[in-house]
Amino acid sequence: MEEMPLRESSPQRAERCKKSWLLCIVALLLMLLCSLGTLIYTSLKPTAIESCMVKFELSSSKWHMTSPKPHCVNTTSDGKLKILQSGTYLIYGQVIPVDKKYIKDNAPFVVQIYKKNDVLQTLMNDFQILPIGGVYELHAGDNIYLKFNSKDHIQKTNTYWGIILMPDLPFIS
């Protein structure tokens, strides 16, 4: 008696099997390329490994740094803050005006944060304490500075501002 296979393999079945293997290989290659692209992108993106913090206080007519010399910023001769490391920065501070009765001119109390020649923030108040700041993406070479409409309007002893480079923190979901 002759043994008969239960199922004969047909050329169509063999062709379908090759197509499904080919499809699986293409899908795996695409996943590998996407993973490799993501890895390259994240490794090339400049990120801050550790934070960097600087605080300034106003003395007589100049800002002076009250913290140790940081690695992410530098002060320029004209009192501006030069960014040395690109990243996300938190700018914070408070500007306290002198009492209104000591003001000789009627100019409004205005404080502005500048990045190069662009205004990042403008604050105006009728001689009240002004909290300043925000979170900004800054790049190496940017210059940041605070500008007042009149230095005679500012209490030098209690006015300060600072900047913190925020480290990129990994989030686990």
From Swiss-Prot:
Entry GO MF terms: cytokine activity; identical protein binding; tumor necrosis factor receptor binding; tumor necrosis factor receptor superfamily binding
Membrane spanning stretches: 21-41
UniProt PTM: N-glycosylated.
Gene inactivation effect: Reduced levels of pro-inflammatory macrophages in the peritoneal cavity following injection with thioglycollate broth to induce peritonitis and reduced AGTR1 levels in spleen macrophages.
GO biological process: adaptive immune response; negative regulation of T-helper 17 cell lineage commitment; positive regulation of cell adhesion; positive regulation of inflammatory response; positive regulation of macrophage chemotaxis; positive regulation of monocyte chemotaxis; positive regulation of NF-kappaB transcription factor activity; regulation of dendritic cell chemotaxis
Extracellular side, ranges: 42-173
Keyword set, alphabetical order: Adaptive immunity, Cell membrane, Cytokine, Disulfide bond, Glycoprotein, Immunity, Membrane, Signal-anchor, Transmembrane, Transmembrane helix
Glycosylation sites: 74
Known function: Cytokine that binds to TNFRSF18/AITR/GITR. Regulates T-cell responses. Can function as costimulator and lower the threshold for T-cell activation and T-cell proliferation. Important for interactions between activated T-lymphocytes and endothelial cells. Mediates activation of NF-kappa-B. Triggers increased phosphorylation of STAT1 and up-regulates expression of VCAM1 and ICAM1. Promotes leukocyte adhesion to endothelial cells. Regulates migration of monocytes from the splenic reservoir to sites of inflammation.
Similarity field: Belongs to the tumor necrosis factor family.
Record's subunit section: Homotrimer. Homodimer.
Protein name per the record: Tumor necrosis factor ligand superfamily member 18
Lineage of producing organism: Eukaryota, Metazoa, Chordata, Craniata, Vertebrata
